C-alpha cells in the first residue's frame, strides 16, 4: 500500500517543515532577478545542468561527473529506489525516518525493512548490520542526520555500514548535513556502492525552487536513465546564483546551530517533556501531555510537527521565533510541575 505524504500549512509561524525561516538575502535576490531576466524562456533548459554541477562540485570537492540534480533530493531518492529495487526487493532503513521512503517503496511495489532506533534516534550499528544481513536486504537508505530525531552517526560508522554492504547500494540522505558534523562525502571515492543525497531546501533556504543532488561514482551510468529537463532554467539559475555565494550562508548556518544548542540547553532538564540532542535544524522531543503542548502552540499561532505517538519536532527559526517557542515550553513546564 502506498503511504501518502502530507504537505504543510502555510500561515502563521511555521516551524513544522524544517524550512529556513528567513528568505534569500536582498542583494542575492536582486542578482537572481537580473540573471532570470536574461534567460531565453522560449528555450529548453540545459539538461546537463553543467554550470550548476560545476559550482556544487567545487563546494563538495568531488568531480562534477559524480553529480546529478533534480526536483529536490526526494526525486533523487525516488529515482534510486526505482532503479535498484525491483518488485519484491527490500529496502532497509530506520524507524523513525523520512516518510517519503515508504512512499517510493510503495510506488515501486518493493518491500521495506525497518530497524527500530532508540528514543533519541541512536542505534547499535553492528546489530543494524547483522540484522540487515539476516534479512538479505537489497538496499540501505536512511537520513543522517536523522529526520525526525536529529541523531547522526559518525563517518567511522558510515564506513562500517558501507563496507559490510559493499555489494548493494548504500544511500545516505544528508538533507541536514550542513547542520551536522561528519558527512559520507569522503567515502564516495573508496566505495562505488555509496550514494549521498543533498538538498538546497534547508541550509540554503531554497525549498520553494525544489533543487536536490545525488552524488556518487556510479552517477555517470545512471545519468542517461534520469528524466530529461528535470530542472527548469529558472531553478538552475537561482540555484547557481545562490551557490556562488555559498560562503555567505555559513554565518546563517552557524547561527541556527547556536540557536539550536541554546534552546536545547534550556529545556534539556525539563520534567514535562524530553528533548533530545540534535545535529539538524530542528529539535525532536516527546511528552505524555503533548496534546496540551500543541494547544499552547496553537494559541500563539505557532505550527510545529506533530507525530502519531507522543513525539513532536520543532524547526529552529529566527531568534524571535525561538524565544516565542521557549516561552511556550517554559509555561508548559511550569504549569504542569
What are these regions (language model features)?
Residues 119, 257, 267-300, 316:
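Conserved PLP-binding catalytic core of the aspartate aminotransferase-like
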Residues 30, 34-72, 260-262:
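Conserved N-terminal alpha-helix of the aminotransferase class I/II PLP-enzyme fold
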Residues 23-25, 193-269, 275:
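PLP-dependent aminotransferase class I/II
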Residues 156, 296-299, 305, 310-337:
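PLP-dependent enzyme catalytic core of the Aspartate aminotransferase-like
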Residues 83-142:
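PLP-dependent aminotransferase-like
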Residues 49-50, 64-88, 210-212:
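Conserved beta-loop-alpha segment that forms the PLP phosphate-binding cup at the N-terminus of a helix
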Residues 119-174, 178:
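Active-site phosphate-binding strand-loop segment of PLP-dependent enzymes
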Residues 1-43, 58, 136:
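N-terminal "arm"/small-domain region of PLP-dependent enzymes with the aminotransferase-like
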